[in-house]
Amino acid sequence: MLFFPLARRGRNENESPLRGGLRAVTLAASVSLGALSGAAVLTVAPAPVAAQQVSALMQSIAEAAAESKDLTAFYRANGYTPVFADDSARARARRQALLRAVQLAPEKGLAPYDTTLLTADLRAIRSERDLGRAEVAMAKLFLDYARDVQTGQLVPSRIDSGIVRQVPYRDGVSVLTNFARSNPQAYLRALEPSSPEYARLLREKARLEEVLAQGGWGQEVPGSKYEAGQSGNGVVILRNRLMAMGYLPRSASTSYDADMSRAVQLFQIRHGLAPDGVAGPGTLSQINVPPEERLASILVAIERERWMNFDRGQRHIWVNLTDFTAKIMDNDRVTFETRSVIGATQPDRRSPEFSDEMEFMVINPTWNVPRSITVKEYLPMMQRNPNAAGHLRIVDRNGRTVPRSAINFAAYTPSTFPFAMKEPPSDGNALGLVKFMFPNKYNIYLHDTPSKSLFGHETRAYSHGCIRLQQPFDFAYTLLARQTSDPEGFFRARLNTGRETVVELEQHVPVHLVYRTAITLPKGGMEYRRDIYGRDEKIWQALQQKGVQLRAVGG
């Protein structure tokens, strides 16, 4: 498949002892890069026999690497030859590049690394055995940094059960082998995500850190509602905050004028609110969010970018759950966008986060009612009234229709009910008139819906987990345009038959269900969305436990 790695493994495997619980101490100021990377590292008296030197060094490296399968395999393959701790120019370049990258880790949204033990090892080198221990300590630090900056500091599934994303963890042996063969600075840079979103998030992180250093965005806005024509102290405070946030040009005006209405509208658009230009309770609550909270959202988004550090597809479908939209992207450009309805906020209805490939669409689909909905919702209804949900067929294990009169619903429990339920194709079908399939074990897909009124809501979390589309026909036309000259005619000819019809996509399209509360704009600026499932709050708490910090950094 286009974007899934062949090798994956748990993130906590082979954790380095260099990273203690705090991991908050950066390189000691008294230890310069030059001191750590220069010839002083190698003040080892030569032994009489070269073979004895090699033997002691090999033994030391083997012992120090024994707790890590990756390091053991790497050093066995290279004959236990140091790649960091010798006096060659290449080894010095590797040390310098790694230590510099580690020093700058907080600028990348990573927790600072505690290199106290490594510093002590480097200073204490007096023998070949010391050299071997220092070599492996550097290699462990490299692998820790490489995994953190490349695929994230957290294991997503351990944060929230709805984050079922497969992170593309790289094989440690290959990463270390390729590093040893490459320009070290270039290789370390290449570990980071290459997406434009990641680069823009880092820039916004730096900007917000400077905002914090300058004292923030000023006083919170009091009151509950402001609108055009008003003036007074509250309006002045609101104007000042909008100016500090960059939504309103500097001026001496003290009234809620047309410029201020436009600024509020722009703010509302950027925060997923109805753009009426009135600063009501919902808008004011977002205006009063402090920059610290926005910076935390940026740091979470950076971590999420690392979880998706793979090729997302030249054409792909991007469903941002918090934004209630579904987009078709071509070369990082939105070529189609529609509103969506996502899973409700109840824990068992929330839409999961994962990536897959769309393979086909079904026109005039039958709704095979999920087992959970059948026994939790419809069975109790039919126990009260056997004729309830009469639009649904009841079928046995062989797919044969069973008349309701033949079923004693009261005799069954959710675990013993032996039947399934289906809804035939129709305008009122729960899936509407088309569904888009990327087969997965979560039974999640995109589809039409007869409940069109929900798309007019600001917050659209109502489904059982699947993604409903406001404009499913146009979505289908955009997908089909690559395999037929008349996509609308092709689609409607099959729709008009009323029969269930499967249409294969000649080229499968990657689908990414994501959850981003901080979203950069290609031409500059940010958009923010509410953390409707509470997932980002969990991620931020976990990042803080790892040692990630909010920083105030002057320009």
Give the positions of each predicted feature.
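N-terminal, cleavable Sec-dependent signal peptides of secreted/periplasmic/extracellular proteins
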Residues: R8, G20-L22, A51, A56
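Bacterial N-terminal signal peptides
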Residues: A24-T43
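Well-ordered beta-sheet/strand-loop patches within structured domains
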Residues: L2-F3, A51-D70, F74-R76, V136, ...
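Cationic-aromatic interfacial patches
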Residues: Q52-Y169
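N-terminal secretory signal peptides that target proteins for export/translocation
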Residues: M1-G20
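Boundary at the C-terminal end of the N-terminal hydrophobic targeting segment
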Residues: A39-L42, P46-Q53
